Amino acid sequence: MFAVIKAGGKQYKVDRNSVIKVEKIDGELGSKIQFDQILMIGEYSKPSFIGTPIVKGAVVTAEITNQLKDNKIIVFKKKRRKNYRRKAGHRQELTELKILDITKQ
């Protein structure tokens, strides 16, 4: 069974026991969280349920396995001939989740 969930303004296709990295979610390591904004749910051999915009009664349960930071991204701005240069770096904080269960009532 698979589902398409909405987390942090992005969409992720998840299966049971899959591991995904999403934007930081506050919580302790090992704690369980539930996603209720499920955009689509289905099985590979059967027709899927597509939400309008979400599937009612569908829940994805996940466990927080790690809190980490992504690779550094360099932002560089320059205006030619004006001696204008700005350099900044950014590291996005991420949460690693293990999908435990996908249910639809």
Swiss-Prot record:
InterPro entries: bL21-like (IPR028909), bL21-like_sf (IPR036164), Ribosomal_bL21 (IPR001787), Ribosomal_bL21_CS (IPR018258)
Presence of the UniProt keyword Ribonucleoprotein in the record: yes
GO annotation, cellular component aspect: cytoplasm; ribonucleoprotein complex; ribosome
GO biological-process terms attached to the record: translation
One example GO MF annotation: rRNA binding
Keywords of this entry: Ribonucleoprotein, Ribosomal protein, RNA-binding, rRNA-binding
Entry superkingdom: Bacteria
Coiled-coil spans in chain: none
NCBIfam families: L21
Function as written in the Swiss-Prot or TrEMBL entry: This protein binds to 23S rRNA in the presence of protein L20.
Family per similarity comment: Belongs to the bacterial ribosomal protein bL21 family.
Subunit annotation: Part of the 50S ribosomal subunit. Contacts protein L20.
HAMAP family: Ribosomal_bL21
Protein's name according to its UniProt entry: Large ribosomal subunit protein bL21
